[in-house]
Each structure stands twice: as structure tokens, then as C-alpha cells.
């Protein structure tokens, strides 16, 4: 164990379970990577357990999907570091994704394409956009026609659906100014 994880270096050797270091914020990247792998396996097992329950009760014409999210900067981009999406999606019938992208002059198309390519590769088939923004806060407000452009971009990248968060605008709480498809 000490040899495999390089714990002999910098006097990190573990001789007793009571000496085992806290992996949060550890300087030992081998140990940190193994712990992250363990955490991702828990997500996969949990989703598989849920899918098994649904599979037991669903009809033959129904499918199982999961809203796989992506890492976030100011929008969705790149792999979700806390989930092994490829492993976790094996128990799903159809891949689902949650893609948020900037609007107005900030929209490049890269966010839709990168996340769409990842989503399509999960099951090597088309996928579902289970959540994306209809309208947003002031910096996210789309130009006229831009929502249609974004929807067509999702479909062109392999999505069989474009579902919006929210249908109607929120009237209270933290997302009061996050607008829906119906802006009332």
C-alpha cells in the first residue's frame, strides 16, 4: 500500500489505520486520484441501483435516462469531474444532458458542440437535452432568433429534444430574474 501510493515519500508512510491521512487536500496525488475514482464509482453504483428499480416497473416502450451535467465555468463546458459519465451511462437506455450556454455576443457554439459530442458518445447514439436555458439574467438574454439558433444547434449535434428550464418565469426566491419560455 505504501509503495503503490508513494506514501514512503515525505514521511507519509502508513503503518496503522489510525495513521491514514485525510485525503481531502492531500499532497499525495496518487491517493487523491484513487479517492476521486472511488467517489465516481459510488455515483455509478447509485445510478445503476436507481435504473434497476425503474427497469423493474417500466413498460417495454419506456426508456431510462439521466440528466448528466457538465463542469461549469460561466456555462456548461467539458467533462463533469465528479462523475464518470461513460461508466454511469451504461445503465441508461438514452443519454440525457443538461447544457447551459451563454447568449448574445458571448455565444460561440463551442459549448453546444463540445457537450453535444460528449452526450452523443455516451451511448454512441442521439441523446436528449433534458435541461437548457430559455432566457436568463440580463447577461444571458438572447438576441431575437437566438433561442431558435441554439435549439437547431442542439438538434444538429444529435439531440432528439430541447427541454427548457423553465416553462414560465420564476416569481420568487433566488431565481426570480431567471426567465422562462413564457416571460410573464
Regions of interest found by a model, annotated:
Residues 1-113:
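Polysaccharide-binding and catalytic clefts of secreted carbohydrate-active enzymes
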Residues 60, 64-184:
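Hydrophobic targeting/anchoring helices
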Amino acid at each position: 500500500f505504501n509503495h503503490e501510493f508513494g506514501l514512503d515519500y515525505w514521511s507519509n508512510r502508513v503503518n496503522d489505520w489510525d495513521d491514514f491521512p485525510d485525503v481531502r487536500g492531500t499532497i499525495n496525488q496518487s491517493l487523491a486520484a484513487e479517492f476521486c475514482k472511488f467517489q465516481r464509482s459510488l455515483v455509478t453504483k447509485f445510478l445503476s441501483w436507481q435504473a434497476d428499480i425503474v427497469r423493474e416497473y417500466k413498460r417495454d416502450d419506456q426508456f431510462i435516462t439521466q440528466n448528466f451535467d457538465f463542469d461549469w465555468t460561466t456555462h456548461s463546458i467539458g467533462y463533469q469531474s465528479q462523475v464518470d459519465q461513460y461508466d454511469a451511462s451504461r445503465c441508461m437506455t438514452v443519454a440525457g444532458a443538461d447544457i447551459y450556454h451563454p447568449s448574445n455576443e458571448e455565444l460561440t457554439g463551442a459549448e453546444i458542440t463540445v457537450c453535444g459530442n460528449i452526450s452523443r458518445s455516451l451511448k454512441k447514439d442521439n441523446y436528449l437535452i433534458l435541461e437548457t436555458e430559455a432566457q436568463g439574467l440580463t447577461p444571458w438574454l438572447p438576441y431575437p432568433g437566438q433561442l431558435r439558433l441554439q435549439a437547431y444547434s442542439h438538434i444538429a449535434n444529435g439531440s432528439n429534444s430541447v427541454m427548457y428550464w423553465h416553462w414560465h418565469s420564476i416569481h420568487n426566491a433566488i431565481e426570480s430574474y431567471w426567465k422562462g419560455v413564457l416571460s410573464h
